Amino acid sequence: MTQPERQHWPLAIGPHVGNLCVDPDDEGEEAIDHNFAPTRRVTDGEVAVDTGEFTLTVVSTHGHTSNHMCVALAQERALFSGGHVMGWSTTVVSPPDGDMETYMESLRKLQRRNDYILWPTHGGPITNAQAYLAQYLQHRLDREAQILQCLADSVTTIAGMVATLYSDVRVELHRAAGRSVLSHLIKLIGEGRVVVADGSAPRGAAEFVLVE
């Protein structure tokens, strides 16, 4: 598993792979399925599977969740990217388990690799891996700039930012979009560029202002 979410596929595939199901060594928070028990836990760089014909190596990519990992198939320069990079949309980074600063650094980590193809959990295969990763990271940088512009234009709430920035997105997806906006704002607060207006902790209902 690339992350211990509340999903059912480990039970479905277990009998076909000798019930081998590996999972990141560090415990996640928000999205974790506490009832899931992996066969063993693995760490970054560990060869999780070695058949003699191919190997599967762990690539820690925290950020989407606190313990997310990808899995590399070196013999095909392929990377199973889980929920870290998706083939049909951008990834939600939802605090507190998701962390935007860590997520963006994990994207840069993948850019330093030489994978040819990405196999995401959601969406089809991505054959232009490096170009796609660059686009994915640039999207986050662009969104960050748009959030800063919203604040400069006195749009100080997450609800207002979502209405402005995601006007072309279905309303039922706005809640998830708001979680990623909050994650961006937490990153900007950590960088000293934004503060919560009343000095409280960042949260979905807070108002945010630029640091002058």
Task: Please place each PLM-identified region on the residue numbering.
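Short hydrophobic/aromatic-enriched beta-strand-loop microsegments
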Residues: 1, 80-82, 173
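Metallo-beta-lactamase
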Residues: 10-39, 48, 55-144
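Hydrophobic residues at beta-strand termini and immediately following loops
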Residues: 42-43
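Generic structural signal for secondary-structure transition and capping sites
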Residues: 47, 115-116, 156, 193
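C-terminal regulatory/interaction regions
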Residues: 149-212
